[in-house]
Amino acid sequence: MLVVSIGGSPSTRSRSGVLLERSRQWLQDRGVEVVSFQVRDFPAEDLLHARFDSPQVQHFQQLVAQADGLVVATPVYKASFAGALKTLLDLLPERALEHKIVLPIATGGSIAHMLAVDYALKPVLSALKAQETLQGIFADDSQIAYGEGAKPAQLAPALEERLHDSLETFHVALARRPRPVAPGVLNERLISARWSI
């Protein structure tokens, strides 16, 4: 299984990034290959000028096309997800998430931002034809405490449990996801099949 994780925060230190990293570790511990992207890893000019021919953008598009699922994490600013994330998602082809499972993760200053996932992020994922967008996770800033120095960030126990449950649901959804059959393979199967009437 291949999962692409996308971090929508332009900041190197972000709570959504903490949850994305925990998700990556959890999935890798279960044998899932995870390739991580952060919006800040892309040249700003590529995002702002929609450079579809950029080597980094093309590499991103190829890995998304190969992925079984995506984990998309974003901070919530002014009742919506990060604008930098939107510019990156806009560089994907129209049906880029077809046959893919998506787990959205969002963080915000208060619980009042929780609906941003449903009313802002999920419609964009739907427009990209995600096969299934899971309920996802929202965490307010008080549930994630940055670690001092090299110490890891601490999650509130309730958040830790919700993250684990959501990742378990995501993992199960990936496992049961039907795999599209390439036209050439399908033709071979039809030719070699035994038919009876």
Swiss-Prot record:
Which processes are annotated in GO (biological process)? alkanesulfonate catabolic process
Going by the entry's taxonomy, the superkingdom of the source organism is recorded as: Bacteria
- Coiled-coil portions: none
- Reported EC number(s) for this entry are 1.5.1.38
Which keywords annotate this record?
Answer: Flavoprotein, FMN, NADP, Oxidoreductase
Provide an example Pfam family for this protein: FMN_red
Read off the InterPro entries from this record. Answer: Flavoprotein-like_sf (IPR029039), FMN_Rdtase-like_dom (IPR005025), NAD(P)H-dep_FMN_reductase (IPR051814), NADPH-dep_FMN_reduc_SsuE (IPR020048)
> Which top EC class applies here?
oxidoreductase
Q: Which reaction does it catalyse?
A: FMNH2 + NADP(+) = FMN + NADPH + 2 H(+)
Q: Which GO terms describe its molecular function?
A: FMN reductase (NADPH) activity; FMN reductase [NAD(P)H] activity; oxidoreductase activity, acting on NAD(P)H, quinone or similar compound as acceptor
Q: Which family does it belong to?
A: Belongs to the SsuE family.
Q: Which PANTHER family match?
A: FMN REDUCTASE (NADPH)
> What exactly does this protein do?
Probably forms a two-component reduced flavin mononucleotide-dependent monooxygenase by binding to SsuD. Required for growth on aliphatic sulfonates or methionine but not arylsulfonates.
Q: What is this protein called?
A: FMN reductase (NADPH)
Which organism does this record belong to?
Pseudomonas putida
